[in-house]
Amino acid sequence: RNLKGLQYTALVPRDEFDHWLDGNHRLVQFVFHLGARTDTAEFNRVVFERLNLNYSKMVWEKCVQYGLPLVYASSAATYGLGEHGYRDDHAIVPFLKPLNPYGESKNEFDKWVLEQKQTPYFWAGFKFFNVYGPNEYHKGRMASVVFHAYKQIKETGKMKLFRSHREDFKDGEQKRDFVYVRDVARVLFYFMHHRKDSGIYNLGTGKARTFLDLARNVFRAMGKEEIIEFIDTPADIRDKYQYFTEADISKLRKAGYTDDFFSLEEGISEYVARYLIPDKCFGE
């Protein structure tokens, strides 16, 4: 469904991509490697090692072999509880402590990349923060909070949020850096043409917003009365629950990306009105 209305030359199963690239690399100008196993509740490390680490190494090595520039998806999950802040400084990568095997697999690849002597002539890894936007119907539990908020409000008329279990945060005041997928695409498109300043970058708006802000904007976009309930954060994740994430995007700006990002209000309004209410995908 995500491919409806889009233009593409070939659909290649992931297990055949290396052989496909061997035979077609002259037709390829740029590689975006964004696919991964992203389930933060999956604890089978073998799956992450195969799909997120070893597969990504293969893509990197093919890009080196054929002289292809590469952009790949890292993740803000690499930052763990933010003990070292949220700076995309290469020097802190070896010291980061992700909270789950997914985040660990992403950080392991970042570490591997920074150790490589042979690199594509241009490469960039992007630590995506909380991305939301069209074409996430297939993602189940791992879809964005905006998507789940819309679904919950549509089905029950209300929205449940985790209450705070810390004195320095009020209920619903936990913050995330929510970034609209159109902004993500714009940044990647910019680097496809820029092809300078290789490195690992944060990709968020640089402005953390509360879950209350998010919920209220979804209610407003749906034209519904605001009914928000607070529930306990499950005990098994309470100690590892992030209360604040915010991308430091100064490095992105220094690389020349100057466009404004969608505000949470703008992004949610467009996403709900243009895609969720009519049940449409981008391209339909």
Where are these regions (language model features)?
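Conserved Rossmann-fold NAD(P)-dependent oxidoreductase catalytic core, especially the SDR/UDP-sugar
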Residues: 30-33, 57-99
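NAD(P)H-binding glycine-rich loop region in Rossmannoid oxidoreductase-like domains
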Residues: 5-8, 14, 20-51
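Glycine-rich "substrate-gating" loop/helix at the edge of Rossmann-like oxidoreductase active sites
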Residues: 99, 129-143, 163-181
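Glycine-rich NAD(P)-binding loop of the Rossmann-fold in SDR/ketoreductase-type enzymes
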Residues: 30, 43-58, 100, 104-105, ...
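Active-site Tyr-X1-5-Lys
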Residues: 84, 97-129, 148-155
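Catalytic loop of short-chain dehydrogenase/reductase
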Residues: 40, 87-103, 132, 170-171
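Conserved beta-loop-beta element that borders a ligand/cofactor-binding pocket
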Residues: 75, 111-137, 159-167
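C-terminal substrate-binding subdomain of Rossmann-fold SDR/epimerase-dehydratase oxidoreductases
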Residues: 153-284
